[in-house]
């Protein structure tokens, strides 16, 4: 799983959706960074800054600065599709992981703030996460260390044969 830190110096001060009142990638950009990590995992060349720029132009944020998850997939519509955005389900998480698809989950940090991380694997009963926030430098670590239940899921799937046309032309 590619590691992208939402507070990377290059983009941490960029406003979400180009609107300063929405906050910055560094402070509130965990959703954008998590989506960028999944897209990068699927071979799509992006980072939180590029995805934020795209979403800003594509009206990809609500008036409160929340990400329209389906519009993020418009970044590479021939490569990835938005599949699910709803309540948590361990069956859906496990099914996605068994098919090689990471899952974005919303958790609530001990401070009460919601945060998005990417479940990239499983070790026994522990889900292993890539955290675009403060835990970014840790690599994969157990979700349970955040001390939160999973509140919601978002996931994307790669579009099958995304490169078949390129291969056929060679």
Where are these regions (language model features)?
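Active-site-adjacent structural segments surrounding the nucleophilic cysteine of cysteine proteases
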Residues: 1-60
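Conserved active-site-adjacent core of cysteine acyl-enzyme catalytic domains
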Residues: 36-169
């Amino acid at each position: 799983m590619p590691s992208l830190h939402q507070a990377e110096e290059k983009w941490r001060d960029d406003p979400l959706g180009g609107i300063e009142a929405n906050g910055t990638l560094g402070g509130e950009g965990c959703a954008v960074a998590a989506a960028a990590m999944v897209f990068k995992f699927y071979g799509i060349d992006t980072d939180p800054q590029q995805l934020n720029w795209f979403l800003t132009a594509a009206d990809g944020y609500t008036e409160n600065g929340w990400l329209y998850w389906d519009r993020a997939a418009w970044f590479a519509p021939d490569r990835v599709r938005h599949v699910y955005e709803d309540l948590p389900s361990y069956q859906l998480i496990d099914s996605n992981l068994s098919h090689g698809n990471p899952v974005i989950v919303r958790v609530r940090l001990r401070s009460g703030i919601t945060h998005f991380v990417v479940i990239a694997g499983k070790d026994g009963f522990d889900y292993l996460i890539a955290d675009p926030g403060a835990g970014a430098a840790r690599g994969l670590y157990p979700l349970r260390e955040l001390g939160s239940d999973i509140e919601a899921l978002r996931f994307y799937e790669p579009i099958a044969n995304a490169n078949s046309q390129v291969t056929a032309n060679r």
